[in-house]
Regions:
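N-terminal glycine/serine-rich phosphate-binding loop of ATP-dependent small-molecule kinases
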Residues: 1-4, 8-87
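Gly/Thr-rich phosphate-binding beta-strand-loop-beta motif of the actin/hexokinase/Hsp70
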Residues: 1-24, 112, 118-140, 156
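Fold-independent oxyanion-binding glycine-rich loops
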Residues: 8, 57-58, 83-85, 104, ...
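Acidic-glycine-rich active-site phosphate/pyrophosphate-binding loop
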Residues: 77-90, 127, 161-172
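Active-site rim beta-loop-alpha module in soluble metabolic enzymes
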Residues: 139, 146-175
Length: 175
């Protein structure tokens, strides 16, 4: 089964084409590029024939709705959005209200636990940095969200006097 996997983040959309359990191709496009060049900045890189589209979205419902519509036209397939659950894929959600856990954190833990099947500290560094702990049984023990490198750099330089940040802007972008 060919599946198109979409990670709709706050800064970028990352995608991967999976054939069974194997990732065949990947790509990324920034929201800025889509604003400047149009949605073709994403679709020209994507396959047209897939059996399923799975998406993880933290960028809001407006963009999710737009991407879902475009994917339906491009691939003639509905987009299925992942949501955190009480348990799934070997992970037990540590939140009393499972959907309060960010879906990006949920899928990062699922992927890490599927790969390593042991106690883990899962770190995802993007626009924000998320850190989550899993025990060896896959129980989510809790986590933290902190600003990403660019947000921290911007806060320091705009809210303080006399601090010079010597990280080039091009290196301060999320992966």
């Amino acid at each position: 089964m060919r599946a198109l996997l979409l990670d709709i983040g706050n800064t970028r959309i990352k995608w991967g084409l999976a054939d069974g359990a194997k990732l065949q191709r990947t790509g990324t496009v920034t929201h800025e590029k889509i604003r400047d060049a149009g949605i073709a900045a994403l679709t020209t890189r994507l396959p047209r024939r897939v059996d399923r589209i799975l998406a993880c979205n933290v960028a809001g419902t407006s963009l999710a709705t737009r991407i879902s519509g475009v994917m339906h036209l491009h691939c003639d397939t509905d987009t299925h959005f992942v949501h955190p659950a009480r348990a799934g894929f070997g992970i037990t959600n540590g939140y009393g209200r499972p959907r309060r856990l960010g879906v990006d954190r949920w899928v990062a833990m699922i992927g890490a636990y599927a790969e390593f099947s042991r106690a883990l500290c899962v770190v995802d560094a993007g626009t924000a940095v998320t850190i989550d702990a899993l025990d060896r049984q896959g129980q989510h023990l809790g986590g933290q969200i902190i600003p990403g490198l660019r947000m921290m750099q911007d806060a320091l330089t705009s809210e303080t006097d006399g601090i010079e940040v010597d990280i080039p802007r091009s290196r301060a972008r999320p992966a």
